[in-house]
A protein has these predicted regions:
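Conserved nucleotide-sugar donor-binding catalytic segment
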Residues: 146-235
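Short, acidic, metal-binding catalytic loop of nucleotide-sugar glycosyltransferases
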Residues: 30-39
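Glycine-rich, basic loop-to-helix element that forms the pyrophosphate-binding segment
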Residues: 74-91, 112
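Short aromatic/hydrophobic "clamp" motif used to bind/position activated sugar donors
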Residues: 96
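Conserved donor NDP-sugar-binding/catalytic core segment of glycosyltransferases
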Residues: 108-139
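A conserved acidic beta->alpha catalytic loop
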Residues: 31, 46-55, 76, 100
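C-terminal subregions of glycosyltransferases and related glycan-biosynthesis enzymes
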Residues: 4, 191, 198, 204, ...
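N-proximal low-complexity "stem/linker" segments adjacent to membrane-targeting elements
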Residues: 1-31
Length: 317
């Protein structure tokens, strides 16, 4: 949608998936309203919450500093992928930015990101981020991983260095890739970035400014570990065929990714003191690695579904 409006607004829709976020969604929306370069709209989808999330979001409308705030509800909890697809289907701008309802942007996030996108052919840009605050704050340096790989796509496949709430991407590229896979209950964002960037030569950027703060909820980082592992292995197998068009060993990248996923699970189970699941993960590791290898070498790749139609409305996959 073209506009002749003041330069303090950018042609961006912010996609906010929210679930049981009544206590945090105001902070998220306030960080959008505080941008030095404002998006034209924020589209919130309340994914079946029972705590008044949608009402808490709607209450922020008078404080959005001219940004259109549109809030939608679903009757049941369908997951973040489905909620984001609904928000994308409702969006009206050529650029999409993503922010979850418990996290926040720093004030210059959108201005700095759009400076790396406008006038270029890049399909998306992302950046570093913070976790924690004060003395416990940690700067996560995503740009180093981006710069550290001869092929950024292979590096992304191996190390998953794009944080979803830092991304601004072209709406048409998101739609062409098919949107978020709602069947993946974890890592839908990682799957979509790989789908958008898998064609060799697709330009994207990760820059080194920490313009996002992730708020780690108690237990959140340690929840759904087994589900994250299963989804991660499925995604690794899904994009194995795309590695064959790249320099280097596709099998080595597959093994690297599957191993990294298991090491992450082991760290979580170790921190929890869950010895049973830790030992089970160690025992299953070689079998999962072998199964992924055999599947990738012997079976034809399953096509990725289309979860947004070509006109950007929500599809069924």
């Amino acid at each position: 949608m073209a506009h002749d409006s003041p330069p303090e607004f950018a042609d961006v829709s912010v996609i906010v998936a929210a679930y049981q976020a009544a206590g945090t969604v105001a902070r998220t929306l306030q960080s959008i309203a505080a941008q030095t370069l404002k998006p034209r709209e924020a589209v919130v989808v309340d994914d079946g919450s029972t705590d008044g999330t949608a009402e808490a979001a709607e209450a922020e409308a008078p404080r959005m500093n001219g940004i259109r705030l549109r809030v939608f509800r679903t009757d049941d909890n369908r997951g973040a992928g489905a909620a984001r697809n609904r928000a994308i289907a409702e969006s009206t701008e050529p650029w999409l930015a993503f922010l979850d309802a418990d996290d926040e942007w720093l004030p210059e996030k959108l201005e700095r990101t759009m400076s790396h996108l406008e006038g270029t052919d890049r399909v998306l840009a992302a950046h570093d981020y913070w976790t924690g605050e004060g003395e416990t704050a940690r700067h996560h340096q995503c740009e180093k991983r981006f710069r550290g790989s001869p092929d950024p796509f292979v590096g992304l496949y191996r190390k998953g260095y794009i944080p979803s709430c830092s991304v601004v991407g072209r709406r048409d590229a998101v739609v062409a890739a098919g949107g978020f896979d709602p069947e993946l209950r974890n890592a839908q964002d990682f799957d979509l970035w790989l789908a958008m960037l898998k064609q060799p030569g697709t330009p994207f950027l990760v820059f080194g400014e920490p313009l996002l703060r992730y708020h780690l909820t108690p237990g959140g980082i340690m929840s759904h570990t087994e589900r994250r592992l299963r989804c991660g292995v499925a995604i690794a197998a899904r994009y194995y065929p795309d590695l064959r068009a790249r320099p280097g060993s596709a099998l080595a990248s597959l093994w690297f990714r599957v191993t990294a996923l298991h090491l992450e699970a082991l760290r979580v189970y170790g921190a929890q003191g869950n010895i049973v699941k830790l030992l089970l993960t160690v025992g299953l590791w070689p079998f999962r690695l072998a199964a992924a290898t055999i599947s990738c070498l012997m079976l034809p790749p399953a096509p990725r579904g289309r979860f947004l139609t070509t006109d950007g409305t929500a599809g069924n996959g």
